[in-house]
């Protein structure tokens, strides 16, 4: 092999090796790019998942807060409505005095437990009615009593309040839910 041929052979080997190195470098560069792209995609997917999870958590927190505020507003509104309804019902008690009140008063007297009732407190309009049912008692008028009566034994050791106001007050926890149901049904 001559000098020229040796140089040509070395050049060919060098070019082949250079081509192989270049080819290997390009393959390695493509592999690195592919790995980097895959990692970037995984990071994007992971980030999107975390973001979606964070958004869902924030949405749940916002919704829970809104539900809590709505519940508080609803409770405050229902409480205010309950007070207004109670006052309205109380102010309407005088209608029970219209027709048949004398019988209602007698029924309230019959509900009293046996006792020596010495003091009877009634609405001023019921003084004569109370005197008929309790001839031996002190009859006292009190304008705050719409109807019914308060009785007590001598010395006040035992007393019974059987006024329309007190009866409504005792029945109110049972009446209110039914009234509210009727109101909501009409809405």
Swiss-Prot record:
GO BP: proton motive force-driven plasma membrane ATP synthesis
Recorded GO CC terms: proton-transporting two-sector ATPase complex, catalytic domain
Function: Produces ATP from ADP in the presence of a proton gradient across the membrane.
Pfam families: vATP-synt_E
Gene name of the encoded protein: atpE
GO molecular-function term, one example from the UniProt record: proton-transporting ATP synthase activity, rotational mechanism
UniProt record similarity statement: Belongs to the V-ATPase E subunit family.
Designated name of the protein: V-type ATP synthase subunit E
Assigned keywords, A-Z: ATP synthesis, Hydrogen ion transport, Ion transport, Transport
HAMAP family from the UniProt entry: ATP_synth_E_arch
């Amino acid at each position: 092999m001559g000098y020229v041929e040796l140089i040509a052979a070395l050049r060919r080997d060098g070019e082949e090796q250079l081509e192989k190195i270049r080819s290997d470098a390009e393959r390695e560069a493509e592999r690195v790019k592919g790995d980097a792209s895959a990692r970037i995609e995984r990071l994007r997917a992971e980030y999107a998942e975390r973001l979606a999870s964070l958004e869902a958590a924030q949405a749940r927190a916002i919704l829970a807060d809104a539900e809590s505020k709505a519940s508080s507003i609803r409770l405050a509104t229902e409480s205010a409505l309950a007070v207004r309804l109670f006052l309205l019902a109380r102010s309407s008690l005088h209608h029970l005095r219209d027709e048949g009140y004398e019988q209602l008063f007698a029924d309230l007297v019959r509900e009293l437990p046996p006792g020596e009732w010495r003091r009877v407190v009634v609405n001023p309009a019921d003084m004569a009615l109370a005197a008929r049912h309790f001839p031996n008692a002190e009859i006292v008028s009190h304008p705050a009593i719409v109807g019914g009566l308060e009785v007590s034994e001598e010395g006040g050791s035992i007393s019974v309040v059987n006024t329309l106001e007190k009866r409504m007050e005792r029945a109110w926890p049972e009446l209110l839910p039914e009234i509210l149901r009727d109101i909501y049904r009409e809405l």
